[in-house]
Amino acid sequence: MRRLIILAEVALGLLFASCTKEEQRTLSVIPAPLKVELQQEVFSLNSETGLYIDASEGDKKILEDYLVASSMNLKPVIAEEGHNVVLKQVAELPEVNSSEGYVLTVTPDQVLIRATSGAGLFYGVHSLLRVV
């Protein structure tokens, strides 16, 4: 009888040990984003994907060199429209409370990174490279 109880305890222990939580999708971005909204839509990088940067000339050159040298293989373009990765330095972002913060938005047609500084754009690009 004692063996039967021990066997039952072991069986229950194995049963509970084999149960796992549902896998959660996480992003390996450091520092962790304040907010993440995962969508079903995806942006597909291809040979036609361009890079448009709307920032100061100094920041633009640094960001362009960094992204062109990356594994994303982007080609600079002169228009924001199209299947592009777009970096925009804007005057203000109400949802961001840091000069180095950024907003990264992905749609099937475009990847848009907005920030109020070159540093914010750089960190946005770094996050993009981490999730690609």
Each PLM stretch: what is its role?
Residues M1-S28:
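Bacterial Sec-dependent N-terminal signal peptides
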